[in-house]
């Protein structure tokens, strides 16, 4: 043990593990509280962020398994290898479009890696027909984590960290 070893001890994090969630869509991060649907804005289904999307695809934001892609193709759940239960819901009232403007690429129960395409969408059509295109990305089992750190600003699908969860 050297004379200086006690001088440079790094402060240990109070969390044992950090799990990063990447952007499933490109666009701008919006506060979840600003989504025009109380189910999301009041965090009834979980905590997270929303994205004002650009582009035309929704990618896997984590390595894991697709739980369910809704028949209307506007939303899906994914469970990560670490047990994160994540829900991506494109737009508000998009269920009423019954799949119009969406094309499913991935399948229920499919294993996916970060960046794999899950759903393609026609942004111009959805801007015209949906009540809102704000896309909530929420952690439905948020109570299992000690802390959530949310990013802000412009993001790139499959590249930018949008949230970090800590155990």
Curated annotation (Swiss-Prot):
Domain notes: The EIIA domain is phosphorylated by phospho-HPr on a histidyl residue. Then, it transfers the phosphoryl group to the EIIB domain.
Xref: InterPro entries: Dup_hybrid_motif, PTS_EIIA_1_perm, PTS_EIIA_component
Binding site for Zn(2+): 74, 89
Pfam families in the cross-refs: PTS_EIIA_1
Cofactor: Zn(2+)
GO BP terms: phosphoenolpyruvate-dependent sugar phosphotransferase system
Active site positions: 89
Site positions (Important for phospho-donor activity): 74
Function as written in the Swiss-Prot or TrEMBL entry: The phosphoenolpyruvate-dependent sugar phosphotransferase system (sugar PTS), a major carbohydrate active transport system, catalyzes the phosphorylation of incoming sugar substrates concomitantly with their translocation across the cell membrane. The enzyme II complex composed of PtsG and Crr is involved in glucose transport.
Domain of life of the source: Bacteria
One annotated GO molecular function: kinase activity
Protein's recorded name: PTS system glucose-specific EIIA component
Gene3D superfamilies found in the cross-reference section: Glucose Permease (Domain IIA)
Modified residues (Phosphohistidine): 89
GO cellular component, one term: cytoplasm
Keywords: Cytoplasm, Kinase, Metal-binding, Phosphoprotein, Phosphotransferase system, Sugar transport, Transferase, Transport, Zinc
Signal peptide start-end: none
Organism: Buchnera aphidicola subsp. Schizaphis graminum (strain Sg)
Main location (coarse class): cytoplasm
């Amino acid at each position: 043990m050297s004379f200086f070893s006690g001088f440079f001890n790094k402060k240990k994090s109070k969390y044992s593990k950090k799990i990063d969630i990447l952007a499933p869509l490109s666009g701008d991060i919006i506060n979840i509280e600003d989504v025009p649907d109380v189910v999301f804005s009041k965090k009834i289904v979980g905590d997270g962020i929303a994205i004002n999307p650009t582009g035309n695809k929704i990618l896997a934001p984590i390595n894991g398994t697709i739980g369910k892609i809704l028949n209307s193709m506007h939303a899906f759940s994914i469970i990560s290898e670490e047990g994160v239960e994540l829900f991506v819901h494109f737009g508000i009232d998009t269920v009423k479009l019954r799949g119009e403007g969406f094309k499913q690429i991935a399948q229920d129960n499919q294993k996916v890696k970060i960046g794999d395409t899950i759903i393609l969408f026609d942004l111009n059509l959805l801007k015209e027909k949906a009540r809102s295109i704000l896309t909530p990305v929420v952690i439905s089992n948020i109570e299992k984590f000690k802390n959530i750190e949310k990013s802000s600003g412009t993001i790139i699908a499959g590249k930018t960290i949008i949230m970090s969860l800590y155990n």
